């Protein structure tokens, strides 16, 4: 499995409110996650980085994704609603042995699966971390096949391509083999 990441701060800011995690587990699974802090700048960066670091610690400790999200949400809320802003979480856990991807979304932007010239969109209407005491997320399982591309993005990218059929653009992209 090949992975790649690109990010950029808003405007001239050296801070980006998005942070990410890619973790390969011994059991043949790979976890990819994007946390997006509300707003932009240093505060959004710090808050999303905290969520990603907590997720990484939970994964390293052997927590499953449900327990990890419950723990992270509880810790985030314990910080106090006046001291933190909500953070979106987009997480995909891919079992490289079976090809099953479990996509978990909490207020996150769409995820795209590109297969040949078609694009499947996974959307969610859930709330971000830190809004409700009980974790609000949607989980969708998808079968991936050799040659598929999973494209996870934050709302910052999608917001900067207004009035365009994003699925159509992604279907036209040709991704070269390494």
Where in the sequence are the language-model features?
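PP2C/PPM family metal-dependent serine/threonine protein phosphatase catalytic domain
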Residues: 1-18, 73-79, 109-141
């Amino acid at each position: 499995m090949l992975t790649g990441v690109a990010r950029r701060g808003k405007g001239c800011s050296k801070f980006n409110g998005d942070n990410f995690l890619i973790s390969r587990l011994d059991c043949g699974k790979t976890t990819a996650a994007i946390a997006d802090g509300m707003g932009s700048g240093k505060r959004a960066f710090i808050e999303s980085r905290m969520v990603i670091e907590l997720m990484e610690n939970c994964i390293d400790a052997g927590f499953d994704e449900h327990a990890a999200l419950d723990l992270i949400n509880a810790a985030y809320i314990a910080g106090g609603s006046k001291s933190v802003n909500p953070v979106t979480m987009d997480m995909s856990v891919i079992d490289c042995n079976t090809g099953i991807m479990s996509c978990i979304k909490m207020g996150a932007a769409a995820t795209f699966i590109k297969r040949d010239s078609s694009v499947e969109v996974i959307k969610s209407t859930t709330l971000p971390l830190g809004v409700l005491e009980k974790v609000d997320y949607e989980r969708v399982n998808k079968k991936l096949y050799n040659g598929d591309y999973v494209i996870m993005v934050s709302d910052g990218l999608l917001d900067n391509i207004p009035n365009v059929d994003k699925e159509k653009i992604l279907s036209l992209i040709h991704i070269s083999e390494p």
